[in-house]
Each structure stands twice: as structure tokens, then as C-alpha cells.
Curated annotation (Swiss-Prot):
The keyword Cytoplasm applies. It is found in: Cytoplasm. Disulfide bonds: none annotated. Residues 39-348 form the Rab-GAP TBC domain. One of its GO terms (cellular component) is cytoplasm. Its main location: cytoplasm. The keyword Amino-acid biosynthesis does not apply. Belongs to the OCA5 family. Keywords: Cytoplasm. This is Oxidant-induced cell-cycle arrest protein 5. Residues 412-423 have a biased composition (Polar residues). Transmembrane segments: none annotated. Residues 497-518 have a biased composition (Low complexity).
Amino acid sequence: MALQRNSKQNQQQWYRELVNKVIQLLQQNDHDSLALIARNCGVPPQLRHLVWPVLLKYHPFVISPSILSNTLIFDKTEDKWVYECENRARRDVEQAVMHDLQKFFVNKRSDQHMPLPDIEQHMRFLRDTIMRFLDKWERVFKYEVALAWIAIGLAEWVPIDGWGESAPGGGGVCSEDMALPKGRSTDVPVLQGKRHHITIRSLYKEYPLPRELSSRLTKRCFNFYDTFERLVLVILHCPDVTRTKMKVANGRNYPFISGGDVLFQTQLFFKIFQMTLPELYQPFTDEESLQSSRKADWIYWWFKACGAKVMHKQDRAHLWDVLLGWRPHPSTLNFYLDYNNKSFAHLYNTKLNLDPQFFHKVCKHGNDHFWFPDLDTLPLGSPGLETDCQVVNELIRHNSYESKDTGAPGTPSKTSQAGNNYRSPIRPSQKHQKDIPFSLIDPHVQLIFIYIAILQQNEFKLLEFEEAEITEFLTKVPLLSKTDDYSYKRLYDEESTSLSSTDTEDSQNSSSRPSTSSHMMIEVGNDDKIANTFDDLSQLAGDIWRKWMWFEFEESQDSV
């Protein structure tokens, strides 16, 4: 019990250190370090309303957008693209938006079926926000229900205009330089509660932040609409699939590094699922849960909406942290954004601006979660490395079985070590880190491996489930990061902050942040016995990525 308590205290000590550092980075406008933190260990929930706008301001998918269009439909019979614009009247679209929002807000158990006035104001504001987005992007994207749930998900962390950060009733619009007024620093009203039992409550009531810290907070760089628009551009991002296919000799591309459309993501998910969890894959595909029906709408929410509606708000926010914190090396931008004709690499700093001790708490092994041997050394996007196929061939050459230097066959390669040693080793080149470890694979592809990790974590439970229980799990995924949520809610409790001097000294001298489990594959699915963090899930996802890549290489070498 004493050991468990000490571990909990160390965990919360790390979270408090993280909150302090993020506030400092906000003051410095160090968006590169904020992005590194977001994608590797997540943004503290107390600070997402300030960090997310900064991350979105400098996000490559926002600066050079390309979203998945639902107004261009490919006609297979005519073998051409057909433009299908929104054919509903504006009022009908507004009613559709309100109908979808009411599914979240209205208490079905109530006799009145009418939300409270403040809830009603939030619903109207979110409707107007969505309509404003559609007015701007209507030629590319017409209304889908995902927009309503993305808006709701954002409102759970970011206050709508006219609430909290400026006086209510001020016309519903705030300037883009919104500050926390003195005396109201603890008033950041957001949506809280379970579905159909929603209240408007200060974010700091659920996730406390002491006044001495909240008084140091910076101005928010975007209002709610601007944050929403940019978030949608990231969630709905899609590479130019047609352009990519033209670069490949046979017209076929397998963009599991640079990213593909939702159809490709879904196909890749099931391929990895079959390889990683064959025992679970079989009953999944046998059940109607994965067929083209209403029961399969979880695929839409997992892949197109990036966890909106179906994930717990804390886990969904972690997924969005990964998306918003994604940053490739500036020199490789055009590999991931092959449609891009803008020059904005100068916006990103490649030099690490974190002290070594803190950096190795953020990146436990000095790498991005989704690193792979030699991938970070390749000049992606340069001649000869413009497509995923070319990159994979080069990686195979770098990680072959036979050592070209010694000529000794059967020498274990670095890839072999990555595939067989499931827990990531520390790479020697990263011991004295001077450069930021940038993202190496598309963020939506990263989510695929996180989803596989979720299924692996719950494999034993799912194997025992009936079809209806599997469907419920997929459409209402239970809270995964229990330790994160509990720790942040109790972060500044007296019991949490009253560490002994020995505990504090041990935590400060620790070179890595604590982990709740030695290995995620131990006690998989025992949700009631072990509390997990999203960091555990991300590390498992990275391990699955490297193991899957190893098997891909094995197949490629066998086919030669």
C-alpha cells in the first residue's frame, strides 16, 4: 500500500511539473515544445482551452488545408467524379444541426424535453458555429452529423464566446485576444456531465488550477469559431489521393506513412487487426457488428470523426492532443502534404528547447512514440523518396538481414530487434538529444494503432462478449485513461500536495516520469484491477506499429 501511494504521489508530482512547464511555454509562445508535449504525453486538461488554439495556429493541416470532400462523389459507372452540392434549404440544415445537438443535450427522462436557458444558448451558439463553417466550406463539405459532435467535444474543453472569458450577454462574440479578467480567473465555463445530464460548469471545478497558476495564464489566440474551424480541418484532413497515385508507376499506393483517406484507414485498420489480434479478429468479422449497417456506424466515428461521440471525453481529448501536436520535420512537409505549394517550414524550430531531464520525462526513450529504425534519417520527399513505396524499399535496404559491411548472413537487423523486443529500446543516437524528435507517420495512421492498442488492452473481455455487448463497447468506449483523469481531478488536493521531503526529492531526481504498469500486455483487460494512463496506451500503440512494420518487411523480403 505504501508503494502504491508513493507511485501515486510521484505521478501527481509529474503532472504538477507538467502543468507548470506548459504555462511557461504558453508565456513564451513556444509552440514547438507544446506540440512535442501534446503528441507524447498529452496536454493537461486544465490548459487545453489555451494550448489547442496555439497548436492549431501552427498546424500544417491548417496552414495548408486539404479535407475529405463529401460533395465530390465518384461515379463508378461513368468512371468520373460528380459534384453533388447541398440540396437542402438553409433552414432545413439548421434544423438538422439542432436535431443532432439535442441528442446530446436534451434530457429524455424529463417531462418537458426542453433544455435550461444556458444550455439553449450553447445549442444555438454551436449551431451558428457549424453554419458559419458550412458557409465558408460548402463547396467542399456539406453538413454531416460529425460536425455537431466535434463542436460538442470542443465545447467540453473550450468555453464558447461570451462565457467566462468575457461578460455573458456581450453579443456572443469575443475578440481573438481574449484574456482571463482579474477576479474571474477560475471561471472557464464548459460542458460537463454525462449525456442527457449536461450542465455548464467551470472547467476548474472538475480539473482544479490554483489561483497563483491561473493568474499566469496567457491570452487565448482564437475565439471558439476559429478554433472549431481549424480543428475540423485537422480531423477531416485527407491527402490528395489522386495526385499521389499519379506518382506511382502502377497507380497503386499504400500510404501507411504519409496517410490516406478514410477508406484506406479502415482497410489498414482491419489488416493490422487481423495480424495483431487474430483470435479477436475472427469473431469480430463473424458478427454483424462489423457489417454495413447501423451497428457498424462506430467505424464512422472512430475513423472519420476521430473519436467524437463514441469515446469518453478525456480519451477523445487525448486523441485530439495527438492530432494537434503532430509535426513532421520541416524539411519533409511536402512528403505528407504533397499537394502543398506554400513555403512555411520557417515557422518551425528544429532545436530542442527543453532541459534534458524534463525532455526525457516527455519522451521516455528520446523518441516519438511511433519511431522506427532509420526512418528519421531519410530525407522524405526528396527525389527517390517521394512515395511510401520508395521509402519502404529504402528502409528494407537499411534494415536487411544480411550485413552489407560484413557479408555475414542472418545477422539480426535493427528492424528485427524492433519487432521482437516489444518494449522500445533506447537508441544510442538519442542519448544527448539536441534536435526535436519529430513525427514520422501521419497522425490519422497513428490513431489506427492506438485503436488496435485499445482492442488489445480489452481483448480478454471482448472475447467473452456477445454481439450486443461488442457493439455497445465500440459505440460507447469506456474510460481508458482512468489514472490520468483521477490524478488531474485530484491534482491539488491537500493529500496530493503534502508529499514528504523524501518523496519530493525522489521525484525531482527521477530522470523519467512514472508509469502505472511495467508492461501493458500484463493483465490485459482487467479494467477493475489496474488503472491505466493514455501514455501506456500510446507506448503499446508504438510497439504494435514497429512489430507490424517488421512483419511487413518480412513479407516483402519473402516475396523477392
